[in-house]
Design a protein with these regions (language model features):
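Short alpha-helical DNA-recognition segment
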Residues: 88-106
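A short, Lys/Arg-rich alpha-helix, primarily the initiator
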Residues: 58-86
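N-terminal cysteine/histidine-rich coordination modules
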Residues: 1-67
Length: 157
């Protein structure tokens, strides 16, 4: 027996049932709009497109969105590593400044490994703000060691 379509609370039509679709997104972790694979079933209204996520759908979407999330972090990390200007800083020097193991950025650039969202954010910031952001990074730890606590408080105000 085929389940009857449910009524849509937005438009009132009786056309809500699990559907596949293109171009759907969901907020997930740090991403405001992570793409949902086209073949995922999400209860939606055929007429107005309203989506209805119940506990079962959310549980099924979790592992799917996690895979998409990891793939997107890997893609962005590789992109930002390629955009970093080598004339300003070598990958090895950057690994040392960021406290990363030797060769980690090369692995990420090749699509291996799973970078943290924080590392992807930092790589994106460095790539977008080069060369100023790279110079700030080079001097960051030196500045921290030379500052006393009152100087830090004055800078915060």
């Amino acid at each position: 027996m085929i389940a009857e379509d449910q009524r849509c609370v937005r438009c009132g039509s009786r056309s809500v049932r699990p559907r596949t679709g293109k171009g759907r997104t969901r907020p997930y972790r740090v991403f405001a709009a992570l793409p949902v694979p086209d073949d995922c079933l999400i209860p939606a209204c055929r007429r107005c497109g309203a989506q209805y996520l119940d506990d079962e759908t959310i549980a099924a979407l979790g592992p799917v969105l996690e895979r998409v999330y990891v793939a997107e972090l890997q893609r962005l990390a590789a992109l930002y590593i390629r955009r970093l200007p080598r004339r300003l800083i070598s990958q090895r020097r950057l690994e040392l400044l960021l406290g990363l193991s030797q060769g980690y950025l090369s692995r990420l650039a090749a699509g291996d490994g799973v970078p943290s969202a924080q590392l992807v954010l930092l790589l994106g910031h460095l790539a977008d703000g080069a060369p100023e952001s790279i110079e700030n990074l080079k001097n960051f730890w030196r500045r921290q060691l030379s500052q006393t606590e009152p100087e830090q408080k004055e800078k915060d105000q």
